[in-house]
């Protein structure tokens, strides 16, 4: 065991907080206007019908309705919110 800290150990000991990214509301879930659907870096998932996009690329619902994930083209996905007809 070393009796001095050493040069490396005093420079360590930092860690950043998790960013808590990802899908917050899944397909088939009912959402109200303003609910966050996805937090993301970049546009991995595009905004579809009745979905807004924030300045940090967060996707959120513009209306009350049901979430649906759809294909944008072969590679990309989009998320839409459709009004419920109950």
Curated annotation (Swiss-Prot):
<feature type="compositionally biased region" description="Polar residues">
    <location>
        <begin position="7"/>
        <end position="19"/>
    </location>
</feature>
<feature type="region of interest" description="Disordered">
    <location>
        <begin position="1"/>
        <end position="20"/>
    </location>
</feature>
<dbReference type="GO" id="GO:0006412">
    <property type="term" value="P:translation"/>
</dbReference>
<dbReference type="InterPro" id="IPR018261">
    <property type="entry name" value="Ribosomal_bL27_CS"/>
</dbReference>
<dbReference type="GO" id="GO:0003735">
    <property type="term" value="F:structural constituent of ribosome"/>
</dbReference>
<protein>
    <recommendedName>
        <fullName>Large ribosomal subunit protein bL27c</fullName>
    </recommendedName>
</protein>
<keyword id="KW-0934">Plastid</keyword>
<dbReference type="GO" id="GO:0009507">
    <property type="term" value="C:chloroplast"/>
</dbReference>
<dbReference type="InterPro" id="IPR001684">
    <property type="entry name" value="Ribosomal_bL27"/>
</dbReference>
<dbReference type="GO" id="GO:0022625">
    <property type="term" value="C:cytosolic large ribosomal subunit"/>
</dbReference>
<keyword id="KW-0689">Ribosomal protein</keyword>
<keyword id="KW-0687">Ribonucleoprotein</keyword>
<keyword id="KW-0150">Chloroplast</keyword>
<comment type="similarity">
    <text>Belongs to the bacterial ribosomal protein bL27 family.</text>
</comment>
<dbReference type="Pfam" id="PF01016">
    <property type="entry name" value="Ribosomal_L27"/>
</dbReference>
């Amino acid at each position: 065991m070393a009796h001095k800290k050493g040069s490396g150990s005093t420079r360590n000991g930092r860690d950043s907080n998790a960013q808590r990214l990802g899908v917050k509301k899944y397909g088939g879930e009912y959402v109200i206007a303003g609910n966050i659907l996805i937090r993301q870096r970049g546009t991995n998932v595009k905004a579809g019908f009745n979905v807004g996009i924030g300045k940090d690329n967060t996707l959120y619902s513009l209306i009350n309705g049901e979430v649906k994930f759809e294909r944008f083209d072969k590679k990309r996905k989009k998320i839409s919110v459709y009004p419920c007809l109950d």
